[in-house]
Amino acid sequence: MKNTTCLKLSIIVASLFGFASATPAQRDAQIEVNTGVGLGNTPPIWLSLSGFTDEAAEVIRFDLYVQGFNFTNAEAAQYLLTGSNNGNVQGQLSDRFNKKAMLGKSYTGASLRRQAHALADDVVEAITGTKGIAQTKIAFKVNTGANSEIYVADFDGHNAQAVTHDNTIVAAPAWVPGKLALYYTSYRLGNPDIFYQDLSTGQRRAVAQYSGLNTSAAPSPDGSKVAMILSKSGSPDVYVAEADGSNLKQLTKTPEDESSPCWSPDGKWICYATRINERRVLCKVPAAGGAALRIPTSGVSNPSEPDWSPDGKWIAFTAQMGDFEICIVPAQGNGPATVLVSGEDPSWAPNGRTLIYARRQSGRYVLSLLDVPTKQVKDVFRISGSDSQPSWAK
Amino acid sequence: MKSTKLTYLLVLGLALTFAAAGCKRKPVNVTPLPEPRAGTVGGEGPSTLPPGESIKPGEEVKPGGLATTGLEEFENMVADRAALAAQTVHFDYDSSVVKSGEKPKVEAVASALKSDSAAKLLIEGHCDERGTEEYNRALGERRALALREALAKLGIDPNRIRTISYGKDRPVENGHDESAWKLNRRGEFILLHPKA
């Protein structure tokens, strides 16, 4: 009798603390190409939320929505997330279809907001198997009229703080992968120059200070190199250098204006916008040097501001066709471009499915988040002025 | 006796564990989150990141070996925006081609530089609001460079000319129609005189 009770108990305990080892119904967080589902056609994961109130509830809803979840009542949802935020956040997640509890956790420390983000991340990971983005950071430009500054914030726009006070024009912040550091452009020294700033100390140094334009710094995925646009040779071209700007190498030599370099996640290619025979196109060039190849974007025109997805499969970019549209195209060039939502200047989250971008609203920019598979969008919490040129920390 | 007590304790223990972990589904995993430290990105409040420290103009670029190429000879000059303000060149949408109708302005700028051999020139390239930001920054630079090339063709040494692009950050007209946009798609000439 003892043995039977022990066995029953261990089964119950095991199932309560079991994680995503049992197959969740919708584990797939990646974007499918040819299944007919994906690229804005994927239905959301349905979840029922109860017990949370006020800010904690808002945070959990926001975080889950921009990662492809949506909310319904407990009779219709597959997943039930119940909990409370009375003093601290705690939550229990269960799968109603498969009749099992998936997690039960309580959070302490930091702030209620942060605890709610941590719960959202744990829910996303339990259901999809991939890491959530609720505790990630963004950098962006805040334009307050004549001048602009670089800001960093939580991915949802909260806890924003300025990291420059240059009282001039700044542009194009880019997070260094895995580091608390940014590259950005500032006119602080009377010219658009590229700086590297260590965010934990505030120390910064110029990385490119050549005559003409120095802008659009893009660190390589391992952080050892940086691509940038320099016009020192007479036309804006793609260059690559060591992370500190030394050992400069010119990768493109066209009379046209190249812009917005971005790296493939394997560090082998740099994609950028340029012009061929009067037509604006996307190209890629080997980071080690070599011939450039065109990346076709059939179905849309005037591509710019590309960003390569973390899984290497997609390039998100802006297409300017009267209005501005966020689009994606297979990075291998073997498929047409797909228009997703109105906006410009996309940057991928580390989860490879959420994009942050800027959209025009009443004469200024606001930042917005898009879950690519479900096309669910949410505006980021507004800071002030016009917020644009977002870069997601990875 | 002992075994009954033991059994009782065991059952009690199991029951409590069962109650705690099972039936009422109370969470037992407690995740403590780290308190924000200075230097942590976006801690929980405004002052946890130091702002970028000031950079002194003229500071040598690190690492050693990289010079601030090409700009030293433009330092310590006085800018005169008015002298060539009438020669601002306008461009077509999404283009850096210097139109033939604008060539007389370029010629006037060339004359001014030829008649004052100590003067240098700063060309500012600008765009209208309709492009995306980094694309416009590159296009503005391309416009300024196109004007420098045009001046070079008229015999002006390109080393006397510096370019700077402001993308769409510095419009002259704030309207949202073509009458404003066409004024913003421009190259401005700023004459530079050596300080007396």
Model regions: which residues?
Chain A
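Amphipathic beta-strand/beta-sheet edge segments enriched in Tyr/Trp
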Residues: A76-D122
